[in-house]
C-alpha cells in the first residue's frame, strides 16, 4: 500500500479476500468505509490531523523502521522528519537528581538538530518536553491513551506549548 503497488480496487479485493477467508468472519467493506468517513469528519471538526504511513513528508519516518508500524496516526501539530529523533524516558516519580539531569541533558542536546520525543506523562516526560520548549528545541509527544486523554491534565497547557513551538502530539 505504502509503495502504491496496488490501486484502491485491488486493495479492497485483496483485503476482502484475506478477511473473508477467515472461517466464520464476515466483513462489510461499505460499513467500514462509512465508519472511516465519519471518523474523518470528526477529526476535521476537532482539528485533528490524520497522518498516513505512505505520506513520506509528514509521517514519522522512524516509525516505518519498526517491525509493526502503524498505518495511520492522529495528531495535533506537526511532525519534524528533518531532525534526529531522540526518545527521553524515565520515572513518573522522579528524584530531584533525575529532574536536574534530565534538564541538563535536554538543554545540552538542544544545540543540535535533535527532536526530543516523550510521552507527555508526569515526571521525566514533562521535564523533557518543558525543557525542550524552554530551549527552543523541537519536541513531539506520543500519547498512550489518545489525543483526548492528556495525563496529567495539567500537561494540557504544555501540549499547547509544544504545538505553539512547532511540535505536536500524536496517537494511534
Positions of the model-derived regions?
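Short, small/acidic-rich helices and loops at N termini and domain boundaries
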Residues: 1-57
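Glycine-biased, small-residue-rich flexible motifs in mid-sequence functional cores and linkers
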Residues: 38, 43-46, 50-172
Amino acid at each position: 500500500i505504502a509503495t502504491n503497488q496496488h490501486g484502491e480496487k485491488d486493495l479492497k479485493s485483496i483485503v476482502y479476500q484475506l478477511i473473508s477467508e477467515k472461517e466464520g468472519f464476515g466483513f462489510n467493506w461499505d460499513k467500514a468505509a462509512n465508519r472511516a468517513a465519519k471518523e474523518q469528519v470528526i477529526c476535521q471538526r476537532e482539528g485533528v490531523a490524520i497522518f498516513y504511513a505512505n505520506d513520506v513528508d509528514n509521517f514519522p519516518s522512524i516509525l516505518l523502521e519498526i517491525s509493526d508500524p502503524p498505518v495511520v496516526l492522529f495528531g495535533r501539530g506537526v511532525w519534524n522528519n528533518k531532525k534526529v529523533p531522540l526518545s527521553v524516558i524515565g520515572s513518573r516519580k522522579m528524584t530531584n537528581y533525575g529532574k536536574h539531569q534530565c534538564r541538563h541533558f535536554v538543554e545540552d542536546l538542544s544545540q543540535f538538530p535533535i527532536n526530543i520525543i516523550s510521552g507527555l506523562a508526569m515526571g521525566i516526560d514533562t521535564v523533557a518536553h518543558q525543557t525542550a520548549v524552554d530551549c527552543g528545541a523541537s519536541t513531539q509527544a506520543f500519547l498512550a491513551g489518545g489525543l483526548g486523554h492528556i495525563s496529567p491534565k495539567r500537561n494540557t497547557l504544555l501540549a499547547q506549548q509544544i504545538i505553539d513551538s512547532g511540535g505536536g502530539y500524536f496517537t494511534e
